[in-house]
């Protein structure tokens, strides 16, 4: 992981350790929005992961039912997911 991604994950971890315990639990999703953002940054890099994390936070409100919402798989080729014909055997 590059230094920017590590720094961003470090900031999220600080939030989880310092702020999250004193705030009331309000995330409607599993995994929590902060865990989702960390996983997204790990899977998609700092830019793509941050974008996915922000979109997730915008969906986390009282009018959304929430539930299980995993990070989408990372693309293996620019602009698309791995084709079944290119899966390693």
Swiss-Prot record:
It is a peripheral membrane protein. Coiled coil: none annotated. Keywords: Cell inner membrane, Cell membrane, Membrane. GO terms for cellular component: plasma membrane. Residues 69-89 are annotated as: Disordered. InterPro entries: Membr_insert_effic_factor_YidD. Its main location: membrane. It is found in: Cell inner membrane. Could be involved in insertion of integral membrane proteins into the membrane. Belongs to the UPF0161 family. NCBIfam families: membrane protein insertion efficiency factor YidD (TIGR00278). This is Putative membrane protein insertion efficiency factor. The lineage of its organism: Bacteria, Pseudomonadati, Pseudomonadota, Alphaproteobacteria, Rhodospirillales.
């Amino acid at each position: 992981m590059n230094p920017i991604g590590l720094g961003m994950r470090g900031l999220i971890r600080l939030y989880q350790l310092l702020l999250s315990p004193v705030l009331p639990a309000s995330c409607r999703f599993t995994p929590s929005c902060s865990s989702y953002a960390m996983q997204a940054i790990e899977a998609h890099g700092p830019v793509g992961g941050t974008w996915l994390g922000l979109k997730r936070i915008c969906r986390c409100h009282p009018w959304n039912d929430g539930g299980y919402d995993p990070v989408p798989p990372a693309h293996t080729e620019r602009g698309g997911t791995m084709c079944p014909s290119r899966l390693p055997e």
